[in-house]
Amino acid sequence: VPATFGYKVAVWIDELCRHVERLQGCEDRVFVAMLGGGAGTLASLGEVGLEIQDLMARKLDMKPMTMPARTTGDHLCEYVTVLGMLASTCSKIGGEVFTLMKQEFGEVEESVPPGTVGSSTMPQKRNPKLAQDIVAVAA
């Protein structure tokens, strides 16, 4: 069943918007000030440990850790996971554009800046350079 290019782009935009929502939704959990001393217990800072952590977090425009610790990394894992999902979507988009640029389909093409050629052997051809770059960078 055929689908228009506009429909494909709408699906991409919808998926990218969900990634933006995910990134915004995890900000308070991900960007936390990790302060706790050698063992992560704030013991070396005594009774003012939590207060110092809160002050440091405010200065860095971050949230303080709810439970200071050195061995937690779930906040970083969450961030990397969301970025991985975003990279996967970008790779998918680049791959689809790459395929749609093939001569068999010819549905889309990348613009070629004035004064340059699209291909070293066939000047009329448009190589999917940007689409390839997106796939490579997202990998």
Predicted segment positions?
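Internal glycine-rich alpha/beta core junctions
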Residues: 3-139
